[in-house]
């Protein structure tokens, strides 16, 4: 009588939980970039990795519930983006590794002890935002040499945005610009923000990064700028693709791609406490010439020469 071979148990497939602060449509390219990063680390969705994705729809009030739901699934790694979403996930767990795809200032927010030595369960990418607002404001001034009054859209609930707002104030003083603070903390604030910019007669507007509400509504924001013939500056090119005038910043898909490789390292045994937080080194200036024409703006040739991409 032959000996029956024992069936081998199926190998466990690791699980990654992903909390995206925006809509599925807005996050599409970023999700694909993250999956590519995981693939390069040897993890293919549906074969060697399982993904659990939740979308915040640009509403930070939903983040705590979605974070709790993801943590209850006991993933091996959590990936998220923007300070409100990172904070929501971190409140739910101090043991499951968390990879930040985008954070304004993780040291100031307390997510990590330092960029070189995170020290806890959080690591990933920082956008060094506090150093960027001045450059963006200066570029906006270069586009409009006669600029004197700029509306600044921001979310005061985002700690990194508070730091960047202070930076923008300092640079504005040096450029002799008057800043109008326009707070956007919820979807309902957007119409009020548009009304405030119109009534105060802003000559241009400038969006601080890390605002999932604004990212989810970037088409509406860009459309407002065109209708009011207001030049605009944004932190990422996704706004310019939707009709905004200019952006200066790192590539979001590139950061999500890198977050995927971080998740892969952790799945292979690396500890987030020992993985330094990375900062982007390449920043792109993108100008939408179609929008410039629509709002009656002639972009100075010197600025056009500095652009990394011109959208015709």
Residue spans of the language-model regions?
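Short hydrophobic alpha-helices and adjacent helix-cap/hinge residues
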Residues: 1-312
